[in-house]
Each structure stands twice: as C-alpha cells, then as structure tokens.
Amino acid sequence: MDLNTLKPALGSVKQGKRIGRGPGSGHGKTATKGHKGQKARSGGSIKAGFEGGQMPLQRRLPKRGFTPLSRVEYAIVNLKQLDAFEANSSVDTESLVAMGLVKSTACAVKILGNGDLAKSLRVSASKFSQSAKDKILAAGGTVEETV
C-alpha cells in the first residue's frame, strides 16, 4: 500500500455540483438560479432579516431588559460530589479543577447542599448555600468564603 494508491471509501465522497457547464450537466443555462428576478442577478443577495420593505420582525418587537455588566457566573458543586475527597483534606478551586468538578480556576465556585457529607473537610469557595454550610460544619469541617 502506497500513499498514491489510497482512495476514499465508495460512496463517502459526493461529487460537487458543477453549475453553468452546458445542457448535458443538468445545471447549465440558468445555473440553478431560475428565471430572472433579484436572486438570479449577480450580487443579488438579500440582507438577512429583509422583508421586502415591510418593517422587519427584529424592529417590530420591543427591546426588553438589559444585561448587567457585573454579573458573576458560578460553577455549581454539590456536597455529594465533595464526598469523593479524602477525610480532613483541603477543598479549594485548584483541587476541584484537578478532580474535574470545575472547568477552570478562573470561575467562581458555589457549594450547594444537595447530598450528605460524612467526612470532615476544609472547604474554601466563593459562596455557600446555608444548608451546605450547616452540613459541612455538622460533619466537623470548616467553611471559608473567598472573595
């Protein structure tokens, strides 16, 4: 087998449509554009959202709300996921990234109280729900909110 003898599998490569190449091709003369009209002309594309002069939908509908610039997006971690850590270990953003529970150290982390925690852990995160705080402290762990 040589590189020059390699061929794609049968039926895997579809031949391109060759338009405007004579009547025998089936796509000659009007080259799949039909007869006359704006879309048959060169440069005859219509802008996205254009409705023939009628007021377009995106201008007919009112503007609604706004996006706050100071919005903070939190990565959510539940207590049942923290159960994977060893007892008395320290849980922070770096360790959560290492375990694959959070994508990056740049994102803020919020710990929620879904599930139970049987181990004592030192947990530091951006935010905690009240139930998560209570369960971590009840298990003998410590809670530290980072900014």
Curated annotation (Swiss-Prot):
One of its GO terms (cellular component) is cytosolic large ribosomal subunit. Residues 1-62 are annotated as: Disordered. It comes from the Bacteria. One of its GO terms (molecular function) is rRNA binding. Keywords: Ribonucleoprotein, Ribosomal protein, RNA-binding, rRNA-binding. Residues 30-39 have a biased composition (Basic residues). InterPro entries: Ribosomal_uL15, Ribosomal_uL15/eL18, Ribosomal_uL15/eL18_sf, Ribosomal_uL15_bac-type, Ribosomal_uL15_CS. GO terms for biological process: translation. Binds to the 23S rRNA. NCBIfam families: rplO_bact (TIGR01071). Part of the 50S ribosomal subunit. Belongs to the universal ribosomal protein uL15 family. HAMAP family: Ribosomal_uL15. This is Large ribosomal subunit protein uL15. It comes from Pelobacter propionicus (strain DSM 2379 / NBRC 103807 / OttBd1).
